[in-house]
Amino acid sequence: MTNFSSLLTTIFLCIISSATGSGTIELLISSPQTVLVEPTVCANFECAAPDDLSLARKVQRRVPLRFGTGQYHGEARERIDLHLKIIEPTSNEILALQHHRPAADTEWNSDAPIVIETSRGFNVTVQLRNLCSSNYHGKRCNRYCIANAKLHWECSTHGVRRCSAGWSGEDCSNPICAGGCSNRGRCVAPNQCSCADGFNGTRCEQCLPRAGCVNGDCVNETPNTCKCRDGFIGDRCDIDIKICSLEKPCANGGICSIDSSSSTGYKCHCPFEFVGSQCKTPLSKVRCSAEHVCKNGGACISMDDTNIQCKCRRGFSGKFCEIGNHGDCSAMRCSAGETCQISGDFAICVENDELLLTTNKPAETTKSVEKWREPRKTANDEQASDELQLRLIAAICVLFSVCVIGLALVSFFFYMHSFSKWKHPSSQQAGGSTILPTTTSIPMSTTSSGTGSPVYKVCIIDSEHRGNAPGSSSDSEPDHHCPPPHRHSPPPAYSSLVLYKKVPMAADDESSFRV
């Protein structure tokens, strides 16, 4: 869309530039005599003759007069219509009246000026040029072009739009980087590259080594790597291999050696009387008062006011027990009266009288060797004992879990059995007696029959069938009904079954008794 708009703008400007011009005609008139000059200039149309609007200007003797006409705007013509009238200022005599049509040009016509011969025999010289208005270009000032620094274009002297220096493309949007960016970045502005990570420079030609690489370069032009230059070593290439010979950092007879693992790049091997990173501290000042004089758990012993000695643990040696010896007696330095022996994984120095390494006491030698091996055997026994204890604890936990589960199952079955007996009690009691359902009452009432004999009526109310209609419990006597239950206060519930026995009665009343 942007390219299409730019194309339309260009076409519109071309149409305007071919038909319209804008500017001012500048004149430069010189005369050997003082005269009045009345010019009439028509840049975009033809003039018939000098008119009343023409203004006479005074040209001093041998003093050129430079002035401009009014600004014109309209059709751009190839030639300018110029009328000149020369007047003598005192008598107003017309000395010359001429008409010229010079070609329009933005440069002065100094090579071919207009020469006007007066009637008094002297000549008046006239030069002119076409001075274009702002944004108009070309000899006829008919090319309209606006420079735009934001869009990176400018206008030539002829009004042709062109890209500014450092830009290219149809829309002047492509920056130019002289020499490119070495395929390690992209050009974002004239001669300005945006480099990829790990590269730098005007053209991204510099490979950046790893951060902290002091005296090194990239390995095979690969960023974030470090290859030391000649004469330097170390992970950061900050150790000069000539440091021992040039600086001589070890004092008091210490021997300097290159050590790339050290922060200083070297290591001092001090004589016995001095200590420190540069062998500058006398041993007499340290003695056993300082912490960790003896390394690796060695014991410090003060020999006198100026000397100390480190008694090292098994497997370590050296002046300060700083050397670990793992099964190698060649690196051990045992003192007089001691012998290096391999005990387990360590090489140790043992006094000769303690080991009793003599041919006439082989039994004691064997006992001494067994004594050194005893700690390893004890350690194995302790490990086996710990494993046995763990297994025993695990077995106890399993047995306890089984017991708890069994007890829970027994309790569950006992509870279910008891609940079943309570839910379904037996219907017969001992002695053949019948246990009736729970009842609420045994109301009895008497009525008189027609003969005067009493009639007994017994109502047995089953607690489980109390909801039935009254009187429905007796099929044999439908005309007699039990009194309705008291609806305000129900009878109390019985807590036990009631055994109803036979009701005593007279022999003659047996026929009238109904249940």
Swiss-Prot record:
It comes from Caenorhabditis elegans. Residues 1-26 form the signal peptide. It is found in: Cell membrane; Nucleus; Cytoplasm. It is a single-pass type I membrane protein. Residues 427-452, 466-494 are annotated as: Disordered. SMART domains: DSL, EGF. One of its GO terms (molecular function) is Notch binding. Pfam families: C2_N_APX (PF25337), DSL (PF01414). Residues 173-205, 203-238, 240-280, 284-322, 325-349 form the EGF-like domain. SUPFAM superfamilies: EGF/Laminin. Disulfide bonds join 132-141, 145-155, 163-172, 177-187, 181-193, 195-204, 213-218, 228-237, 244-256, 250-268, 270-279, 288-300, 294-310, 312-321. Residues 431-452 have a biased composition (Low complexity). Residues 130-172 form the DSL domain. The chain crosses the membrane at residues 393-413. This is Anterior pharynx in excess protein 1. One of its GO terms (biological process) is regulation of germ cell proliferation. Residues 27-392 are extracellular. Keywords: Cell membrane, Cytoplasm, Developmental protein, Differentiation, Disulfide bond, EGF-like domain, Glycoprotein, Membrane, Notch signaling pathway, Nucleus, Repeat, Signal, Transmembrane, Transmembrane helix. Disruption phenotype: RNAi-mediated knockdown in the L1 larval stage causes an endomitotic oocyte phenotype; effect not seen if knockdown is targeted to germline, rather than somatic cells. RNAi-mediated knockdown alters ovulation. Spermatheca calcium flux is altered by RNAi-mediated knockdown. RNAi-mediated knockdown, on a lag-2 mutant background, induces the presence of 1-2 extra mesodermal lineage (M lineage)-derived coelomocytes. RNAi-mediated knockdown on a lin-15 mutant background, causes adjacent vulval precursor cells (VPCs) to adopt altered cell fate. One of its GO terms (cellular component) is nucleus. Glycans are attached at residues 123, 200. Residues 414-515 are cytoplasmic. Probable ligand for lin-12/Notch and glp-1/Notch receptors and involved in the mediation of Notch signaling. Involved in the lin-12/Notch pathway signaling of cell fate in vulval precursor cells (VPCs), acting redundantly with dsl-1 and lag-2. Contributes to the establishment of the dorsal-ventral axis in early embryos. Involved in the specification of the blastomere cell ABp fate, probably acting as a signal from the P2 blastomere to the glp-1/Notch receptor on ABp and ABa. The gene is apx-1.
